[in-house]
């Protein structure tokens, strides 16, 4: 599994980028919203990747942040949505906008995505409504999201899944018990989980 590539931009296109990693050029498929944010030719880049293994070929897909990579992987679990459809979603809207549309069952927003009709929009809502932990973050204030994301990533490193810790994090955040120090927040989350298990 290729988790990321770190190198220099060799060539940029609206739908792909070639990255020079120690003299080896990797072609990485991207969504169109990513293109304007790419570094220029010869500049350094670190890109998070997903490797898709098909019958006759390997395809790399690249993202500048983990949120977009997570959404891409999640979309691949929806019936009838392949890599092309997942890239179409990310080309059309940011992850938070998509999650908000799923959470509010907003078909009108979803059918703006190229290739997504009413039935596909309904299928996305049905299949993702209960299994995407990020939906609970939709109503979180924008300035709080980096803190919560950092906390969740730290807990993932400790071996906890997002779905396992997100309810406790959201409860603590709702009650304004979380501070700005990640280590202290981890202790609060683990304490809350321990109390929950004793109930």
Curated annotation (Swiss-Prot):
Stretches for region Domain III: 148-199
GO biological process: DNA recombination; DNA repair
Pfam name, any one: HHH_5
Domain II: annotated span: 65-143
Keyword Secreted: no
Domain of life: Bacteria
Chain segments carrying region Flexible linker: 144-148
Main localization (coarse): cytoplasm
Domain I: region residues: 1-64
Cellular component aspect of the GO annotation: cytoplasm; Holliday junction helicase complex; Holliday junction resolvase complex
Gene Ontology MF terms: ATP binding; four-way junction DNA binding; four-way junction helicase activity
Compartments it resides in: Cytoplasm
Keyword DNA-binding set for record: yes
Function in brief: The RuvA-RuvB-RuvC complex processes Holliday junction (HJ) DNA during genetic recombination and DNA repair, while the RuvA-RuvB complex plays an important role in the rescue of blocked DNA replication forks via replication fork reversal (RFR). RuvA specifically binds to HJ cruciform DNA, conferring on it an open structure. The RuvB hexamer acts as an ATP-dependent pump, pulling dsDNA into and through the RuvAB complex. HJ branch migration allows RuvC to scan DNA until it finds its consensus sequence, where it cleaves and resolves the cruciform DNA.
Subunit: Homotetramer. Forms an RuvA(8)-RuvB(12)-Holliday junction (HJ) complex. HJ DNA is sandwiched between 2 RuvA tetramers; dsDNA enters through RuvA and exits via RuvB. An RuvB hexamer assembles on each DNA strand where it exits the tetramer. Each RuvB hexamer is contacted by two RuvA subunits (via domain III) on 2 adjacent RuvB subunits; this complex drives branch migration. In the full resolvosome a probable DNA-RuvA(4)-RuvB(12)-RuvC(2) complex forms which resolves the HJ.
NCBIfam families documented for this protein: ruvA
Record's comment describing the protein's domains: Has three domains with a flexible linker between the domains II and III and assumes an 'L' shape. Domain III is highly mobile and contacts RuvB.
Name of protein: Holliday junction branch migration complex subunit RuvA
